[in-house]
Amino acid sequence: MIIVLSPAKSLDYETPPHVKKHTIPDFVDDAAELIGGLRRLSPQDIASLMDISDQLAHLNFQRYADWSPTFDSSNSKQAVLAFNGDVYEGFDAKSLSASDLDYAQQHVRVLSGLYGLLRPLDLLQPYRLEMGTRFENSRGKDLYAFWGARITQALNQQLEKKKGGSRVLINCASTEYFKSVKPKQLSAPVITPVFEDWKGGRYKIISFHAKRARGLMARYLVENRFDTPEQMKAFDSEGYAFDAQASNDSTYVFRRRVAD
């Protein structure tokens, strides 16, 4: 079983990591190529390309200038500890044990516009480059063209290493990021958990809650060491429950109803 997550725009480089163990991203050369292109952009270009404020554009202009193909503790932090958005508040890696992080290192992957595919303990230098950014590059008009089948091939390599249990990919990533994966080329089926909350008289996906829940699900799978997707259905964190009638073989729907 492999679980894929989206990255986060919000980053935490202030809190010291509680583990020293780390690895180096697999696609450093590809990331360096993208950085080379990004360094040719002015802060104004970055603001326009990414639809961000001038302040954020200048911050990322400096990040690209500072980026180095050499990763160490002075310029980097483990990815799952550096990402700090809603998904990662749910995953809460800083409270995972060393053995849980070791398991996550084998079973969790983070999709990234700059780094392609990250393991949880891969060192990460600060950046902003969302997968959906229409950043023209040597391989095409956007980052989907840049990464092509590389991410899918890397996932297949991981899936093929798994012995025992189900060979399945659990998609806890956003639509934007999972578009970088080619499901028809995967060597395993994909199951996507969907999280809905009751609001306005019906169940619907509420972005903030759904992001957090995807992190909660990833943590649940890591902590319980599950090896079949059927076991996912027992997930009940923060009031969610599996809804069999709303689900099918490839989409598991979890719903939560609190007072309006």
Curated annotation (Swiss-Prot):
InterPro entries: YaaA. One of its GO terms (biological process) is response to hydroperoxide. One of its GO terms (cellular component) is cytosol. It holds the Pfam family H2O2_YaaD. Belongs to the UPF0246 family. This is UPF0246 protein Bphy_1979.
